[in-house]
Amino acid sequence: MPGSEDVYERLLASVKVLTAHARARGVRFLIENHPLSTIAGHEGRRLLPMVTSDELCRLLVDVGDPGFGVLIDVGHLNISAHALGFDRVQFVKTLAPFIGGFHLSDNDGIVDQHRPFGRDAWFMPLLRDCPRAPVTIELSRARTDEILQTRDAVADSL
């Protein structure tokens, strides 16, 4: 994780408070994976935490509360996997027991474009590994027919 251990400890303390707050209201607290792009313009420095499955697993273990989980943004994941060279599918499989939801969109692996996708999208088979996780389709500048085709692709995969 970028930054000092102090940054992580502050994040951990905040997540514990937010998880307890959510649990008291009958909901889970989820944290979304961040994207890391090769074009971020930060001279190769990582400015955001929670990009890799190792970082997310560490936080999950340290929080140690079933009321805390992860929300996988597959667009962010595609960008980070492209930038860091890790396996996207293994990332999801590693975190599957903790996944509380998905944000679904397609992109070129460099920029988070929120493009429509079809039944053949790389992440579609993985949705079956987390059948209770809600999905949100995130599209930008999509035509109505693209939105409906994307919706149907997701419905068919569940």
Language-model-derived ranges and their functions:
Residues 1-70, 79:
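Active-site acidic/histidine proton-transfer and metal-coordination neighborhood
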Residues 1, 41, 53-158:
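Histidine-acidic metal/acid-base catalytic patches
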